Amino acid sequence: MTKYNNKAPPSPAVLRGVSVVSVAASPSSFSLPHNLCLRRHCRSLEYDFSFLKPLYKVERERNHPKQGPSSDFQGLRFSFSTMAILGLIKRVTRITVNNSRVRVYPVRYFQSKDLSSTNLFNGEDAAKLPVLIVGAGPVGLVLSILLTKLGVKCAVVDKATSFSKHPQAHFINNRSMEIFRELDGLAEEIERSQPPVDLWRKFIYCTSLSGSTLGTVDHMQPQDFEKVVSPASVAHFSQYKLTNLLLKRLEDLGFHVRGSKESDGLEADSVVARQILMGHECVGIDANKDSITATVSFLKGGKHMKRNIQCSLLVGADGAGSAVRKLTEIEMRGERDLQKLVSVHFMSRELGEYLISNRPGMLFFIFNTDGIGVLVAHDLLQGEFVLQIPYYPPQQSLSDFSPEMCKMLIFNLVGHELSDLDVADIKPWVMHAEVAEKFMCCENRVILAGDAAHRFPPAGGFGMNTGIQDAHNLAWKIAALVQGSANSSILKTYETERRPIALSNTSLSVQNFRAAMSVPSALGLDPTVANSVHRFINKTVGSILPTGLQKAILDNVFALGRAQLSESLLNESNPLGNQRLSRLKSIFEGGKSLQLQFPAEDLGFRYLEGAIVPDNESEAGDPEVPSGRRRDYVPCAEPGSRLPHMYVKILSDSTREVIVSTLDLVSTEKVEFLLIISPLQESYELAHATFKVAKEFMASVKVCVVWPSSDDGLERKSNSALAPWENYVDVMEVKKQNGEGTSWWSICKMSERGSILVRPDQHIAWRAKSGITLDPTLHMRDVFTIILGKQ
């Protein structure tokens, strides 16, 4: 791989109290208090920019001819005549002073090109494809949908020749379901297609599926179904089924799935947008100052062929063994090889019907003298299951898990034979807890997302969900860059925001995995003992023993451990068995076993820095360290947080009652910010300023005016207060049928004089808890400058 160094000229920055931050919309808007002495500031400017070539002058007389020249202004004119910024600033159109900060607004500042010598999407030199996504899993497909809906052209390549039918991930948390609500009814279709919640709300611990029950944990609470904190519920839906629904939406957007043979018609060194090329493996990445060239390998007529694909950005969403990550030499950091397992995918409607009638659940933890395993019931109605079995290579090999051997193990764990058992797939996998040292490289042109950037234990279901949220965070930033409202530095905020979340979710997943191990430990099956024996055999004197003897030692150790699960020992009449069963009961009742839902982390994660404007009243420091226990979500409106959910009524539709979530007010079809205010004069003034500034930045903004709930029949419209601007919506708080309910601003813990600016990904970019005291136009210009990376 060839990395490039593209040294950009110094970007405008605060220098000795002076900041060059934005551009005025009109030359006539030049203003400066003529009685304000700026000689000291001018000397600072002259000193700080003395290395720049003089290119222009600022003439106060043009805008204040009656006042004539002043000595103060002469000094200012001389200082600004030295400010060329290496030729990037052609003309100054406004100078303002606010809180002793001199602001110079050059004409080109609001133009789409970055303040750097190279722009990612610069006209004639633009790459043929704006974005290439490597990996056609849920993360890559969701990203391609989001980008396409936002108007960004992209294509997808994947080394697999077909889409996997292995169920893999299956738990979809609240935040991911909220994102799926944006994808043309995907969340609703998942809710309709998934098994009924009563068939998967529990984890069951037993000696066999037809034997004694050691414990049952119900992971659903009443509030989980009331949609108080989220408009979406969690779901249990296999990954391959989700993939099918995502492909359906991509087809509706004009995408075509092609194999290596079907891609023959494409140009040799290009890929047109809206293509999903299967059987195309990324084998090389070459970066230069203008673009990325990905080399993909594919089979054609039995021969390995290669195709070069030129793009502006490349997103590696190609899973835990990411080729993109390896090609760019990005290291993973964390715990490796927590556990090796074999995953057995099988079908049995007979077993599904039995469990529906006797003990429905999502996960079954089975411990007996013949075997140990975790059974994932992906769909009891269809009889689809995956059995996870501990695996200890090299003493054990995949050949030890033949279909016949797996059938025997399944019968032992079920407690009886099944007449319709069909083993569909057997595959080994390794559990890691790692996060990439960085999510971006090659001047932010190569980006990692999903499992390519972080690998978690499956405990808690954070793997796919974190990846879906990666895509949601990244899509609007790429679109803002492509469409010209943001600078390329906005892409760096993807890593700044998402990597800390990945680290937190890694910690939480490990905590949850340790909690899962507490149950076998209580039964006398300490997993650390098995791992220690395995390490001893592989790394010490045991490694010189014949392979057959090594395997025999390992098998005997495991058999000895499982002997503690015999019915004669594990019962209340046996003192040791009674003690162990009492410990189990304590673990289950105390909520110390494996958990399924984590509302606080699912909905309450917050970006502490990035494309946000922190305020002085936000909680500082690192977020609370995950405990591995369920904590309820508490709504928060601090910058970086997800916008709180509340149902509101759209007042502009007089023909019918339209009730939506506050999350639904954020556009899914374009990069648009949402300003939420109250119907107050000062808030309307802020809205006018925000509209004006957004136009300068070539950004879109919509204003939402939240009216308090009332039945007085008075008209609630903001058209006259917001004219001539038209992109606004009036909404009214919806109270419960009994009249109870909390106001919007109370939920946000803010005054009604406050305001909230929401990003296109439904996270809060900025807020004012109780109004702003500064010039609203200047203030919002600073806000958009920070969010869009134009500092």
Stretches found by the model and what they are:
Residues 136-144, 246, 316, 423, ...:
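Conserved mid-domain beta->alpha element of the FAD-binding
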Residues 259-292:
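A conserved short coil-to-beta-strand element within the FAD-binding core of flavoproteins
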Residues 207-239, 298-300, 304-308, 356, ...:
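Conserved FAD/dinucleotide-binding core of flavoprotein oxidoreductases
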Residues 4, 97, 101, 479-638, ...:
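C-terminal helical "tail/cap" subdomain of flavin- and related membrane-associated enzymes
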Residues 213-218, 340, 344, 358-394, ...:
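Active-site substrate-recognition segment that forms the wall
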Residues 124-156:
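N-terminal Rossmann-like FAD-binding beta1-loop-alpha1 element of flavoenzymes
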Residues 165-252, 256-267, 367-368:
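Active-site-adjacent segment of FAD-dependent monooxygenases/related oxidoreductases
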Residues 309-319:
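Short hydrophobic core segments
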